Swiss-Prot record:
Residue ranges the record marks as coiled coil: none
Protein name: Phenylethanolamine N-methyltransferase
GO cellular component: axon; cytosol; dendrite; neuronal cell body; perikaryon; terminal bouton; varicosity
Binding site for S-adenosyl-L-methionine: Y36, Y41, G80, S81, Y86, D102, N107, D159, V160, A182
Native species: Rattus norvegicus
Keyword Methyltransferase: yes
Pathway linked to the protein: Catecholamine biosynthesis; (R)-adrenaline biosynthesis; (R)-adrenaline from (R)-noradrenaline: step 1/1
Length: 285
């Protein structure tokens, strides 16, 4: 899922996997989507009026990559969507078939409320408005949200700790032209080797030459989502870079955001955020 500062995405923990992964899976049964959204997507972290804030930074990173025109195609898969949609607001103009995913049914249900425009759905309009502002295409936020809803074709379970993260059902078209993943892998991995293995697993869903847009927490060890206090594997910028290279990517861009003191609100111990744009290397024959 996505977190906020961003805690996490619960993509993936099979109770039949190793003990560390099983422990993570059990902890996530207490995850509360609305508490997570309040902690990370309502003010102060959800205040988009300050361009130096974490929210504008993440949205700007995504918009700038798509503005290059180098990331497009037919099929996009969002890995560990959590209860959030902001990570797809720039992407939806460039892909006609989008799959959202999460390990937790409660997060998939939360996404469904927004996608179906049901009463009580979380209000993402401030984020949609901000993306329209920075993209400057003359598009209204209502048009932006309509397009995203129309292009999300399915919301599926996922387990990034399995060699086939989406299973063998064939419900999502594969391989994807692009992957997005925000605050997922570090949040659902008990240690660095599991994080690297999860990245390798999701990379199998991506075509050679395809792009990964990857956002996550730097040097974070825990975060809160209601009564749940969830462990995170702390990663550094260099460890993220090394994991991408080991999974067969060329790193096109890797940048970091240092969390300012006024946004360290006690809901986690995150030190910063990373954003990576990486391209899966095509094997030469």
């Amino acid at each position: 899922m996505d977190r906020g500062s961003d805690p996490k995405h619960t993509a993936g923990m099979d109770s039949d996997s190793d003990p560390g992964q099983a422990e993570v899976a059990l902890a996530y049964q207490r995850f509360e989507p609305r508490a997570y959204l309040r902690n990370n997507y309502a003010p102060p972290r959800g205040d988009l009026s300050n361009p130096d804030g974490v929210g504008p930074w993440k949205l700007r990173c995504m918009a700038q990559v798509f503005a290059t025109g180098e990331v497009s195609g037919q099929v996009l898969i969002d890995i560990g969507s959590g209860p959030t949609i902001y990570q797809l607001l720039s992407a939806c103009a460039h892909f006609e078939d989008i799959t959202m995913t999460d390990f937790l049914e409660v997060n998939r249900q939360e996404l469904g409320l927004w996608l179906r425009e049901e009463p009580g759905a979380f209000d993402w309009s401030v984020y949609s408005q901000h993306v329209c502002l920075i993209e400057d295409k003359g598009e209204s936020w209502q048009e932006k949200e309509r397009q995203l809803r129309a292009r999300v074709k399915r919301v599926l379970p996922i387990d990034v700790h399995k060699p086939q993260p989406l299973g063998a059902s064939g419900l999502a078209p594969l391989p994807a032209d692009a992957l997005v993943s925000a605050f997922c892998l570090e949040a659902v991995s008990p240690d660095l080797p599991s994080f690297r293995q999860a990245l390798y697993h999701i990379t199998t869903l991506l075509r050679p030459g395809g792009n990964l847009l990857f956002i996550g927490a730097l040097e974070e060890s825990w975060y809160l989502a209601g009564e749940a206090r969830l462990s995170v594997v702390p990663v550094s910028e260099e460890e993220v870079r090394e994991a991408l290279v080991c999974s067969g990517y060329e790193v096109r861009d890797l940048r970091t955001y240092i969390m300012p003191a006024h946004l360290r609100t006690g809901v986690d111990d995150v030190k910063g955020i990373f954003f990576a744009w990486a391209q899966k290397i095509e094997v030469q024959v």
